[in-house]
Amino acid sequence: MRRALASVLATVFALSAAAANAAEIKVISAGAVRALIAGMIDDYSKQTGHKFDFTTGPTGFLRGVIATGQHADLIIASAPLMGELEKTGKLTTGSRNDLGRVGMGVVIREGAPVPDVSTPEAIKQLLLKASSIAYTDPKLGGTTVLHLMKLADRFGITDAVVKKGVLATGGDDASEKVAHGQAEIAVSLISEIVPIKGAKMAGPLPGDTQLWTIYASAIPMSSKEPAHARAFIAALTSPAMAPRWSTGGFEQVK
């Protein structure tokens, strides 16, 4: 994979002379892609000498950071949030790139019995029987907790889910809490389950309980390093990187 990235970088350098000089690139990103982007940043930095200021968090956190006018060279966020930013003129026209889509899954501790998650009714019963459920603090406005609460409302079990709640700072933290035995189960984005040691996906949410979220990158109007940001995104979205996205839980946007 590192050889593939090196090959991609050769093309990037040919397309962008600006990428030849070391720079500091500030990236504000959704937690759903944290593990993937962190690994790619590490490889890219070693190859180019560029430094990165990498900040991640749930959707509500990102919305707040951007609303304060904080500088960023690159934003990676869910499609709905990108839509909001486009409407308010905060993004450079034509800079948006859809990176992939990711679904949600049920998290259990590695080695624990795998529960039935094959039908909506099975999900309802699992939520009712679980002793504790980890999820992002609703005040942070994360994608997963908003969907989980919609499902709980649909099943008529909101009070039960809330009482069992173990609050986390994000989907990956919810998966961590399950891995460390602080909660029996969690419902997280698949990309926030795969990289967590000690956590295992019992299965994806079934049928109409599933929520697919597209994540995209874009260059904000406040970017001080737009050329370097474009070069980095060119590397991330190259065909050579497709296996890395797939392994990380993402599917191509159709």
Please describe what each predicted stretch is:
Residues 23-68, 79-89, 95-102, 108-254:
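Exported/periplasmic ABC-transporter solute-binding proteins
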Residues 16-22:
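Sec/Tat signal peptide C-region and signal peptidase I cleavage site
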